[in-house]
């Protein structure tokens, strides 16, 4: 009956991979002067986003401010109910630049920027079978 076990495992993994899980989005939250992290290179683990005044948090956001000579001055990471504009970076009156990014998977606003998705795990298990 090993083939029955493989079929059951395949069906379970397919269901888990294709059906989105119902849970609160988890984002890295490192925002404001009272943070214990500098947000540029160190940051806390992703946490569940609270409900915001505009509804649920559908996006993780990262906002970076650059000086006029191109140095990264400030980084903020937070939960957001709206996506960043399609033009990621805008010029500031000070000569610097403000770049905004948004994503909608757990921990996607970290320094690494990506975490493996369920599909990656699914493919890895299939390769082992």
Curated annotation (Swiss-Prot):
Stretch forming the signal peptide: 1-24
Chief location of this protein within or outside the cell: secreted
Official protein name in the record: Omega-scoloptoxin(05)-Ssm1a
One cellular-component annotation, GO: extracellular region
Propeptide span(s): 25-46
Species this protein is from: Scolopendra mutilans
Keywords: Calcium channel impairing toxin, Disulfide bond, Ion channel impairing toxin, Neurotoxin, Secreted, Signal, Toxin, Voltage-gated calcium channel impairing toxin
Entry's localization field: Secreted
Miscellaneous remark of the record: Negative results: does not show insecticidal activity.
Function according to Swiss-Prot or TrEMBL: Toxin that increase voltage-gated calcium channel (Cav) currents in DRG neurons by 70% and 120%, when 1 uM and 10 uM are tested, respectively.
Modifications made to the protein after synthesis: Contains 3 disulfide bonds.
Gene Ontology molecular function: any one: toxin activity
């Amino acid at each position: 009956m090993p083939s029955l076990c493989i079929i059951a495992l395949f069906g379970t993994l397919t269901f888990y991979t294709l059906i989105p899980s119902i849970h609160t989005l988890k984002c890295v939250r490192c925002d404001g002067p009272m943070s214990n992290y500098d947000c540029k290179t160190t940051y806390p683990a992703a946490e569940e986003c609270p409900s915001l005044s505009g509804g649920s948090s559908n996006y993780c956001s990262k906002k970076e401010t650059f000086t006029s000579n191109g140095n990264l001055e400030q980084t903020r990471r937070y939960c957001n109910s709206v996506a960043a504009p399609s033009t990621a970076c805008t010029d500031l009156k000070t000569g610097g630049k403000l770049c905004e990014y948004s994503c909608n998977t757990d921990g996607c606003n970290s320094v690494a920027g990506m975490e493996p998705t369920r599909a990656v795990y699914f493919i890895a298990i299939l390769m082992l079978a």
